[in-house]
Design a protein with these regions (language model features):
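Beta-strand/loop substructures that line and gate deep hydrophobic ligand-binding cavities in soluble
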Residues: 54-128
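Hydrophobic ligand-binding cavity/cleft-lining segments
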Residues: 1-39, 128
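A generic structural signal for beta-strand entry/edge sites
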Residues: 3, 46-48, 69-73
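Juxtamembrane/interface motifs at transmembrane-helix termini
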Residues: 38-42, 94-95
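Residues embedded in well-ordered secondary-structure elements
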Residues: 1, 52-54
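Generic structural detector for well-ordered beta-strands
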Residues: 9-13, 52, 64
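A generic structural signal for short beta-strands and their flanking turns/coil linkers
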Residues: 34-38, 45-49, 57-61
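Hydrophobic pocket/interface hotspot
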Residues: 19-23, 29, 49-51, 74-76, ...
């Protein structure tokens, strides 16, 4: 199991294609994950993106877009290990805090997209 393991999901009332258009912008990746070096491993279009991760972490990350009813569930996964940390030093790290910070980064991404795509939409109304 990875030391950093995040699995999260958020519903966005918008079509997967619209969500994918927001997720696929590399400039946004630097805002959402400024310290990570992301290399696209697989661009899945309206199904999301898979990356390899380098920098302070080494591993994989994915945003999977699942069509659900009148919107999209944005699944965010990160599986990684701290870089340049010995097994002995790993035990002294605040892994819970590191996982929490990475989960918050994922929520920042999904809520930014949600806010943009659901702007002006009344609760219970269909997506635009």
């Amino acid at each position: 199991m990875s030391s950093i393991q995040v699995a999260d999901q958020t519903f966005v009332a918008a079509a997967p294609e619209k969500v994918a258009a927001r997720v696929s912008v590399p400039a946004r990746w630097r805002a959402w994950w400024p310290d990570l070096v992301l290399d696209v491993r697989e661009d899945r279009a309206e199904k999301g993106v898979r990356w390899t991760v380098a920098g302070p972490l080494t591993g994989t990350m994915e945003v999977w877009l699942e069509p659900v009813m009148d919107g999209t569930v944005v699944h965010y996964f990160l599986h990684a290990e701290p870089t340049r940390v010995s097994p002995q030093a790993l035990a002294s790290l605040d892994l819970a805090g590191m996982n929490h910070a990475r989960r918050l980064a994922g929520k920042t991404m999904t809520f930014e997209i949600k806010q943009q795509l659901e702007a002006g939409r009344a609760a219970g109304e269909p997506p635009a």
